[in-house]
Amino acid sequence: MSRRAVILSAVPVSTALCRYVQPGDFVVACDAGYRNAERLDLRPDLIVGDFDSAPQPKTEHETIVLPHVKDDTDTQYAAHWLLEHGYDEITLLGALGGARLEHTLANLATGLYLAKNGVNVLLANERSELWYLVPGRELILQRRDWKYLSLFPMEGRLTGVCIRGAFYPLENAVMTADYPLGVSNEFIADTAQLQCSGGCGLVVLTRDDA
């Protein structure tokens, strides 16, 4: 049985993202992410951070105060903690967008770290979902109201790429990080199936601009 957790990072989210939180999920708020917990009416099970982007909250929730000088971001620390405690299905909210692009890139790296360690990981905001494609694990995605399906290599080369159920199918293809071959594909079936044999990929589902 999967152990589910939600990481709340600092980018403000809308209440629409409540749909990604299930009863019983372990909720970790990272630094200013505790404000997202308040927006979503969630009670964090754990708060972590160095509190450089928001004051440390006065709360009875378990809190781990991190040093300002450290290698891990607050979100990366939360990812380490959850992995060490056996969580294998993790959703990151408040991790995309915001004023600092480098934080989004750092959170994508954190997601990759989790995926490479066997976690089923999802990053989501109001317009998109991001999933990781790793060797040996077929990714089956539901069409729902998604318009675009894009695939990007995360580690230089993505090999043995197969995409089915999309307008631009691929079979045993090689993708490289310096050529965006996989951008703006579209569903042609109720589900799309993606596989790879080497490297790691990032799959982005996006709703229509209209």
Give residue ranges: language-model regions.
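N-terminal beta-strand-loop-alpha-helix module at the start
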Residues: M1-P57
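Long, charged alpha-helical interface segments
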Residues: S128, L133-A210
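Short, acidic/small-residue loops that bind anionic groups at enzyme active sites
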Residues: Y113-E129
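A glycine-rich helix N-cap at a beta->alpha junction
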Residues: E62-H68, G118-L122, K147-F152, R157-L158
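General beta-strand structural signal in soluble alpha/beta enzymes
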Residues: L8, V28-D31, G49, I64-V65, ...
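Short phosphate-binding loop-to-helix
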Residues: T63-H85
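Short Gly/Thr/Asp-enriched flexible loops that form oxyanion-binding sites at enzyme active sites
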Residues: L101-L112
